[in-house]
Amino acid sequence: MADVDDFDSLSNAELRAKMLAQGLPNIPVTDSSRKVLVKRLRASIGGQASPAASPKKTNRRETLAPAPGAPSAPAAASTPVDKLDGNKVAPATKARRTITAAEAKEPVRRLPEEAIRRRPDEADRLRSEEPVAARKPTTAPAAQPVQTRRTSTSSGSERKVVEPLRKPETIVEQPASSKRADREENYLKVNSLIVLESDEEEDEQLVQAADLVEQEHAARQKTTKLASSGTTTYEYKSKVVEPPRRQVYEATAAPVLPPSVPSARAQTTSSTRSYDYASNPAPGRYSSFVRTAAQGYVTAEAPPVASYSSSYKRTYANELSDDTDSKEDQYESTFARNLARLRAERIGDRISPYSRRTLASGNAGSGSLGYEPRARRSLRPNDNSVSEAFNRWLNSLEQKYHIKSKLFIVLLVLLLIGVYYIFY
């Protein structure tokens, strides 16, 4: 232990020589690596493995430094491996490598001490004898893995030769497969003939079905033509209208009627156009009757349809009104018309009554379609006096701050102060 404790007092060169004598690799000793190398040296002297050295680095340095002593260890280690497991080649080689790395350390590290202590002649004699001893065991076991390989390859080749003998068995089965192929070909030929015959039958059925569809379609077209010719039937009834009025909106042109209709139209100057649903002879699901804007209203000595004109003017008050009022008004009841008039009166003028005027007759409240609305007046009243504005301002202050009671208290205090100054 005294030798171990003296490492801290040694210089770098002495410590390096001590490491080489112990069998450690030739590493230069510096102040930074001194502690690590001292630990490795103490571990090697104590019989422990160096903690910081990896096996790869030690193997490289050990094989390079002592050249003659290295082959003796693997040679000695290779003999028991071949004897224990001679049949398996790959595990034997792996076992050699791992055992040599472990066993080669001690003789390599202790060779320099023996060489230093003994004479140089004895060291040379040991180095010359060790390779001779290493050559003897390596020659004999080297042949064993070769023999095992030869036996393994020969056994594998024998198995491979035996396997092709089974091929004639498959050749014997070929005529049976050829019979099956012939049967399948014959079966396909028979089926193909059946498929062709069935295609012809389907084609004939398709042609017959197409003819039936064409015949049914032609019959339907004939029935629809007959039904459409009798759907547009109109019944005109003469009726006296009181009071008469003029149309003040622009109506769309009426559809062209059948040639039998104008004769009935020429007989009456004032008539109501109504559609009689009971007189429709069409048994179909849908009717071709289309109701237009020129039907369903009452005319009283009105000019022809083409001469209708509108004197309705667009103003700011009715700018946002519906554009289809003229079309929808004919379906409205009198109650709906009166309600619309009352709403217009409320919206228009808030002081004077607002009336809907008919442009043609000038009667107010008659429920006519066209009217000329007046411009809306401003919401501010006309008479704004200063006293009324001041009263409104006082009322607002009273509602918000209750200022009357506070003003009364202030005036009472001022009155008391005045009385005090007057009498005292």
From Swiss-Prot:
Residues 42-186, 259-278 are annotated as: Disordered. It is a peripheral membrane protein. PROSITE patterns: LEM (PS50954). Residues 271-400 are annotated as: Required for binding to Med. The modification Phosphothreonine is found at T63, T324, T358. Expressed in all cell types of the germarium and testis. Expressed in nurse cells, follicle cells and oocytes. One of its GO terms (molecular function) is transcription corepressor activity. Residues 103-133, 157-170 have a biased composition (Basic and acidic residues). Changing S54A: Loss of phosphorylation by Cdk1. Phosphorylation at Thr-63 by aurA may be required for exit from mitosis. May be phosphorylated by Cdk1 and Pka-C1. Residues 1-30 form the LEM domain. GO terms for cellular component: centrosome; chromosome; cytoplasm; endomembrane system; nuclear envelope lumen; nuclear inner membrane; nuclear membrane; nuclear periphery. It is found in: Nucleus inner membrane; Nucleus, Nucleoplasm; Cytoplasm; Chromosome. Residues 406-424 are annotated as: Essential for nuclear membrane localization. Changing T63A: Prevents phosphorylation and displays an increase in the number of mitotic cells. Residues 400-424 are annotated as: Essential for nuclear membrane localization and germline stem cell maintenance. Disulfide bonds: none annotated. GO terms for biological process: cell division; germ-line stem cell population maintenance; germ-line stem-cell niche homeostasis; negative regulation of DNA-templated transcription; nuclear membrane reassembly; oogenesis; positive regulation of BMP signaling pathway. Residues 1-50 are annotated as: Required for binding to Med and germline stem cell maintenance. The keyword Cell cycle applies. It comes from the Eukaryota. The modification Phosphoserine is found at S44, S50, S54, S152, S192, S198, S321, S326, S378, S385. Inner nuclear membrane protein. Involved in the attachment of membrane vesicles to chromatin during nuclear assembly, and is probably required for centrosome maturation and cell cycle progression during mitosis. Essential for differentiation of certain tissues and the maintenance of progenitor cell populations. Required for the differentiation and maintenance of male and female germline stem cells (GSCs), as well as the maintenance of somatic cells in the GSC niche. Interacts with Med. Interacts with Lam. Interacts with aurA, alphaTub84B, gammaTub23C and gammaTub37C. Interacts with Nemp. This is Otefin. The lineage of its organism: Eukaryota, Metazoa, Ecdysozoa, Arthropoda, Hexapoda.
